[in-house]
Every structure is written in C-alpha cells, then in structure tokens.
Swiss-Prot record:
SMART domains: eIF-5a. The gene is eif5a. Belongs to the eIF-5A family. Pfam families: eIF-5a, IF5A-like_N. This is Translation initiation factor 5A. GO terms for molecular function: ribosome binding; RNA binding; translation elongation factor activity; translation initiation factor activity. The keyword Kinase does not apply. One of its GO terms (cellular component) is cytoplasm. Functions by promoting the formation of the first peptide bond. The lineage of its organism: Archaea, Thermoproteota, Thermoprotei, Sulfolobales, Sulfolobaceae.
Length: 131
C-alpha cells in the first residue's frame, strides 16, 4: 500500500485521506477550539473514492492520519467485457481488467481503442476520465 502521513490540521478540502481503510476525498473540514486545557479538534467529512460512501473523522488537529499516494496513468481500452473492461497501460504495455464505471457520463464514452485516464490508489484502480 502506498501511503504517506500528515496531521489532521493540514487537511484541506479536495485533498485525500484514508478513513477506515478506504481512500476518501475531503469535502468539508471544520475545526473547533476546545477549553483551556484541551486541544483543538477537527471534524473531517470525506467521500470514498471507490465506494462513494460518506465518511467522517473526528480527531485532534495534531493527530497523524494516512494519506494515499495517487498514481495517475493513461491506458487504452482493448475490450468491453460486460461489467469489466480490458485496458492496456500505454507506458508499461501491461494489460489488466478494471471495473466499468457506474457514472453514465463515463460509461457512455467507453468503446474499444479509446484512451482513458485511470488512478491507482492503494493497489486498486479506478477510471477517472475517458478521452
């Protein structure tokens, strides 16, 4: 798994964080200063990259959290096999199967020989854009 670490206080909207083992995109960060002897707390709301589920993280701002390293690649669609797509990476020429995206905007553009951008996050792949 390719991850790095940062503190909760450094998270911004649009950044990525691992919550419950799932890579998520941060959509909201609120910070609350507690009493005289307590430390500041942060409430992070994020949406799972693969599941689309809403997740929350409540933690002190100085707590370490995992941040996934996102590898962006370009590939070419070789075959459409129902709910999966066979893709060839245009840099390494490796072929692999990847799940077809559920978004109608992406699914309508999928056809053989089309180029696509996919992300590899924590050993899993996701189609982000079809050219």
């Amino acid at each position: 798994m390719s991850i790095t670490y940062t503190t909760v206080g450094e998270l911004k909207v649009g950044s990525y964080v691992v919550i419950d083992g799932e890579p998520c995109r941060v959509v909201e960060v609120t910070k609350a200063k507690t009493g005289k002897h307590g430390s500041a707390k942060a409430n992070v709301v994020a949406i799972g990259v693969f599941s689309g589920a809403k997740k929350t993280l409540m933690a002190p701002v100085d707590q370490q959290v995992e941040v996934p390293i996102i590898e962006k690649h370009i590939g070419q669609i070789i075959a459409d096999m129902g709910n999966k797509i066979q893709v060839m990476d245009l840099e390494s020429y490796e072929t692999f199967e990847i799940e077809k995206p559920t978004e109608d905007e992406l699914a309508s553009k999928i056809k053989p020989n089309a180029e696509l951008e996919y992300w590899e996050i924590m050993g899993r792949r996701k189609i982000v854009r079809v050219k």
